[in-house]
Amino acid sequence: MAKKKAFTPLLYLASIVFLPWWISLLFQKSLESWVTNWWNTRQSETFLNDIEEKSILEKFIELEELLFLEEMIKEYSETHLQNLRIGIHKETIQLIKIHNEGRIHTILHFSTNIICFIILSGYSIFGNKELVILNSWAQEFLYNLSDTIKAFSLLLLTDLCIGFHSPHGWELMIGFVYKDFGFVHNDQIISGLVSTFPVILDTIFKYWIFRYLNRVSPSLVVIYHSMND
């Protein structure tokens, strides 16, 4: 009976890690053909933001210039002009396909991430008992660690998240999340998040040390500041 009680929270933890990912992947595969068909056949309007519109126009102009340059070095004939029109037509269709694939990717990834969020919310609402057990295990594990190890772990975590070299890591992480949700890459938004998010985390962490750690474990705060200095 005791083994069963101990096994249930572990099974719950494993399901939190793998089940949302598995269900969202299954959902994405099952909806991919339907979304592709809907977008390519029934979507009459094309929604472009400024970045996408500029990118597609630049690619089209570059393509047109290359094809015209290629034809300029040849003899002008009706056949060559016809080939030029066919080439522009084919590449235009290819650009449209690339744009459609990007839009389909956005819809699918955004939908699957919403599903993951709903599943995790359901876990937090209906799995309160298992979460309490897991929380008690984590607190017991942290309580058994020495203050030196705790201070070292805090220092390592803060250096990784808000240290001198952290902006590059945040840039990669935010860019990955941004891409995972299917949004178009935007350097201005990503750089803005990279410059503000670590500052907010640093403020929250210092407030947490001041309000919580000073009251619970003053010795840990002393060791942490000694290591940090």
Swiss-Prot record:
Localization: Plastid, Chloroplast inner membrane
InterPro entries in UniProt: CemA
Descriptive protein name: Potassium/proton antiporter CemA
Signal peptide: none
GO aspect biological process, one term: potassium ion transport
Sequence intervals crossing the membrane: 7-27, 107-127, 189-209
Family membership noted in the UniProt record: Belongs to the CemA family.
Listed Pfam families: CemA (PF03040)
Function: Contributes to K(+)/H(+) antiport activity by supporting proton efflux to control proton extrusion and homeostasis in chloroplasts in a light-dependent manner to modulate photosynthesis. Prevents excessive induction of non-photochemical quenching (NPQ) under continuous-light conditions. Indirectly promotes efficient inorganic carbon uptake into chloroplasts.
The keyword Chloroplast is assigned to this record: yes
HAMAP family hit by this protein: CemA_PxcA (MF_01308)
UniProt KW keywords: Antiport, Chloroplast, Hydrogen ion transport, Ion transport, Membrane, Plastid, Plastid inner membrane, Potassium, Potassium transport, Transmembrane, Transmembrane helix, Transport
A Gene Ontology molecular function term of the record: proton transmembrane transporter activity
Catalytic reaction(s) noted: K(+)(in) + H(+)(out) = K(+)(out) + H(+)(in)
Membrane topology reported for the UniProt record: Multi-pass membrane protein
Annotated GO CC locations: chloroplast inner membrane
Keyword Lyase: no
